[in-house]
Amino acid sequence: MEGGGGSGNKTTGGLAGFFGAGGAGYSHADLAGVPLTGMNPLSPYLNVDPRYLVQDTDEFILPTGANKTRGRFELAFFTIGGCCMTGAAFGAMNGLRLGLKETQNMAWSKPRNVQILNMVTRQGALWANTLGSLALLYSAFGVIIEKTRGAEDDLNTVAAGTMTGMLYKCTGGLRGAARGGLAGLTLTGLYALYNNWEHMKGSVLQQSL
């Protein structure tokens, strides 16, 4: 047995000497600093102290300078575009209804189709322009109020809605501006109430307990 082991060692040593690998052995610590040509080094995140992985607060991956929530300026584009599309769709349906009502005594022919199509396009453009203008004014007032106050809350929503209604109806005099402001205040107030309904219910339940 010992002779076999010795002959095996001699054979291994001979092969090692043949391939140029003979000599003193190297440990893993000695080879740790040897650069690997043509290979990527090991990731530095493989050996990390677990204490550095504990986070006390929530963190989000955000672009530099970005807020955790969208501001008024970011939402303005979506608001204006959505209102224009909604107005166009509603106006088209209203125009179709009016066109069919006004031409109900006419037979189905090309003049009737043209008249209905004109009514659809006219009403669609009218409502899209109206809602788009309101959304533009509302977004502009919201951005201005947010930058002025330095805060984003429901007060900005209500104030922007009130000012939008007043400015949109200011051509009707003080009474028209007052009516427009009241309409904007009512709509935005209901919207703010809807957004905070769950929070208000939770507060009431906590007070009752």
From Swiss-Prot:
Q: Which GO terms describe its cellular component?
A: TIM23 mitochondrial import inner membrane translocase complex
GO BP: protein import into mitochondrial matrix; type 2 mitophagy
TM stretches of this protein: 73-93, 125-145, 172-194
Where does the record place a coiled coil? none
Query: Which membrane topology term applies here?
Result: Multi-pass membrane protein
Where is the major localization of this protein? mitochondrion
Q: Where in the cell is it found?
A: Mitochondrion inner membrane
Q: What keywords appear on the UniProt entry?
A: Membrane, Mitochondrion, Mitochondrion inner membrane, Protein transport, Translocation, Transmembrane, Transmembrane helix, Transport
This entry's Gene Ontology molecular function terms read: protein transmembrane transporter activity
Question: Which Pfam families has this protein been placed in?
Answer: Tim17
Assembly notes: Component of the TIM23 complex at least composed of TIMM23, TIMM17 (TIMM17A or TIMM17B) and TIMM50; within this complex, directly interacts with TIMM50. The complex interacts with the TIMM44 component of the PAM complex and with DNAJC15. Upon mitochondrial depolarization, interacts with PINK1; the interaction is required for PINK1 accumulation at the outer mitochondrial membrane, kinase activation by autophosphorylation and PRKN recruitement to mitochondria.
Summary of the function given for this chain in its UniProt record: Essential component of the TIM23 complex, a complex that mediates the translocation of transit peptide-containing proteins across the mitochondrial inner membrane. Has a role in the activation of stress-induced mitophagy by protecting PINK1 from OMA1-mediated degradation and facilitating its accumulation at the outer mitochondrial membrane in response to depolarization.
The family annotation for this protein states: Belongs to the Tim17/Tim22/Tim23 family.
Q: What is this protein called?
A: Mitochondrial import inner membrane translocase subunit Tim23
